[in-house]
Amino acid sequence: MNARAEGCTAAPDPSSRVVRHERGQHEVFCGLTGIVWLHRKIQDAFFLVVGSRTCAHLIQSAAGVMIFAEPRFGTAIMEEKDLAGLTDANDELDRIVTQLIARRPDIKLLFLVGSCPSEVIKLDLSRAALRLSQRFSPAVRVLSYSGSGLETTFTQGEDACLASLVPVLPASTGTEASLLVVGSLADVVEDQFIRLFDGLGIGSVQFFPPRNSGSMPSVGPNTKFLLAQPFLPDTARELEHRGAKRLAAPFPLGVEGTTGWLRAAANAFGVDEALFDKVTQPARVRAERALDKFRKELSGRRLFFFPDSQLEIPLARFLSRELSMELVEVGTPYLHREHLAEELKLLPADAAITEGQDVDLQLDRCREARPDIVVCGLGLANPLEAEGMTTKWAIELVFTPIQGYDQASDLAELFARPLVRRAKLVA
């Protein structure tokens, strides 16, 4: 813990923390949004959404793909006759997939992604994926998962995608312990972590999802895994069913979180404390210095999180402990107490945490509190800006590389920038 965190009073027992639970109208994107970063990560995969024109517009808008680009996602649009049961949706899906694979021979992994419309008509994409995978094997593997927005939030799309992959991961055959880092990370962040793990002597490290489908990690009883993202409960459960063991750790946001995350791996692999300090200290010092220029702008600022990305708890820990921001309310769509236990220990004991959403009630509390900055979804940002509040889009925190030491200052800047912009507008 650095000196700047010493004044915080942390809760000693995460299970004893009082959490407000709300169930009402919510304001979030659906899981289809995860395709935007997943299609960039797995470079020989294609994501075929089986949905409506609204689904197609959402993905196209979120990805910002230009009309002359050829992305690795698309939508098999369901028309009214499909929804009415006047056509065989499976025959049409087979035709579209056959055309797609013939046109794009670079595709090695195809995901059929369910949506609200496909789930409403009970289209069984898992059976379709099995049928198509048998047809196009071994050149193309076909899997399915749900990106439906019914009672979900947008980061659950990645969880569903990775969970669908775990059962088909190869089984590890060796007896040597290996480390698996779970959750999409930008390539630059992944490379930084590889260098740190190599320095610590943890050489057998794999990342999931990998950069291409031919590099899928092996999993077994000797696999220890670190979650790089806090929104992967289904993936973690599937890995545990394969015998892998999760390492309890905070998430790698900021200096403190990254150090705790790396230390969990170091302890599990018997790395000497002196070696750990030697390897991590240069990056820690560099990150601390980079954060200094944002502390004056952010210290004492009051912060309100609407539930959106499931990153809220680790972000609140980073901003309160390393940048001395005050937490008015930390809303999160779902609170997995086991996976977030190390984070909850570090949050101020008096932090107000809300699980779930009743957007009208939360808007009332936000307006009453008048925080300095509000982290929320796109649908709430513009109305709140019109009311004179400063906002930060929650989805930007998922699209931007923010994990690790070298990105700590970039993460801080994401919160400082809106405040600086507001100050200039007022002036």
UniProtKB/Swiss-Prot annotation:
GO terms for biological process: light-independent bacteriochlorophyll biosynthetic process; photosynthesis, dark reaction. Pathway: Porphyrin-containing compound metabolism; bacteriochlorophyll biosynthesis (light-independent). Gene3D superfamilies: Nitrogenase molybdenum iron protein domain. Its cofactor is [4Fe-4S] cluster. It comes from the Bacteria. [4Fe-4S] cluster binds at C30, C55, C116. It comes from Rhodopseudomonas palustris (strain BisA53). Protochlorophyllide reductase is composed of three subunits; BchL, BchN and BchB. Forms a heterotetramer of two BchB and two BchN subunits. This is Light-independent protochlorophyllide reductase subunit N. Its EC number is 1.3.7.7. It catalyses: chlorophyllide a + oxidized 2[4Fe-4S]-[ferredoxin] + 2 ADP + 2 phosphate = protochlorophyllide a + reduced 2[4Fe-4S]-[ferredoxin] + 2 ATP + 2 H2O. Component of the dark-operative protochlorophyllide reductase (DPOR) that uses Mg-ATP and reduced ferredoxin to reduce ring D of protochlorophyllide (Pchlide) to form chlorophyllide a (Chlide). This reaction is light-independent. The NB-protein (BchN-BchB) is the catalytic component of the complex. Keywords: 4Fe-4S, ATP-binding, Bacteriochlorophyll biosynthesis, Chlorophyll biosynthesis, Iron, Iron-sulfur, Metal-binding, Nucleotide-binding, Oxidoreductase, Photosynthesis. InterPro entries: LIPOR_BchN/ChlN, Nase/OxRdtase_comp1, Protochl_reductN. Pfam families: Oxidored_nitro.
